[in-house]
């Protein structure tokens, strides 16, 4: 199995531009599984609830997830990507898992960092594991790594690969 990641600096608020960057990079990627950054569609560091509401989308029916599904189908790969999710009036810092067969799942970040608590609700999905055929994968997002139980829970549930979309903003982050 070939696993890759594409770490880049998403431009805040420029969803179409960020998705164009992702598509161009993944069109050249030779991988079965690709992991993209936390909030890669919207960019990071929201300053207001209005920004979050304007940039968040429903999952799986929103335009970002749908475009990623199209890319995954065309490239025959699984993609894990971060985006701001809106479920009714509640917003989450989420990561979608999509593949050649379409939408696989969504993880909502459990451990919010600093000002994320002003704009996002703590995740309610729990730590999940998905069988993508070549491996069983789990997802945790950025600050979740700070809590060892996140990775431990995924391992105990059978994750062979832990995908970790991140937008590390602290100077001591690995």
Model-predicted segments: where are they?
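Short beta-strands and strand-loop turn motifs
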Residues: 6, 80-81, 163-167
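Extreme N-terminal starter segment of soluble prokaryotic enzymes
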Residues: 1-5
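Active-site catalytic loop in hydrolytic enzyme cores
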Residues: 57-60, 86-174
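Cys-nucleophile CN-hydrolase/nitrilase-fold catalytic domain and related Cys-dependent amidase chemistry
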Residues: 24-100, 169-174
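Residue-level recognition of beta-strand->loop/alpha-helix junctions
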Residues: 7-9, 37, 45, 108
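Short glycine-/small-residue-rich Rossmann-like dinucleotide-binding loops
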Residues: 7-9, 39, 141, 167
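A conditional alpha-helix N-cap/helix-loop micro-motif detector
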Residues: 15-19, 61, 143
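N-terminal phosphate-binding loop and adjacent alpha-helix
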Residues: 7-25
């Amino acid at each position: 199995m070939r696993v890759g990641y594409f770490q880049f600096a998403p431009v805040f608020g420029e969803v179409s531009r960020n998705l164009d960057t992702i598509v161009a990079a993944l069109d050249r990627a030779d991988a079965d599984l690709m992991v993209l950054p936390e909030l890669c569609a919207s960019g990071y560091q929201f300053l207001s609830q209005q920004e979050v509401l304007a940039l968040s989308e429903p999952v799986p029916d929103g335009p970002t997830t749908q475009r990623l599904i199209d890319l995954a189908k065309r490239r025959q790969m699984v993609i894990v990507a971060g985006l701001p999710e809106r479920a009714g009036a509640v917003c989450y810092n989420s990561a979608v898992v999509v593949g050649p067969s379409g939408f696989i799942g969504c993880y909502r970040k459990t451990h919010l960092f600093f000002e994320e608590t002003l704009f996002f609700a703590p995740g309610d999905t729990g730590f999940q594991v998905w069988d993508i055929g070549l491996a069983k994968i789990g997802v945790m997002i950025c600050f979740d790594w700070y809590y060892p139980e996140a990775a431990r829970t995924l391992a105990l549930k059978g994750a062979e690969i832990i995908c970790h979309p991140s937008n590390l903003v602290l100077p001591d982050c690995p």
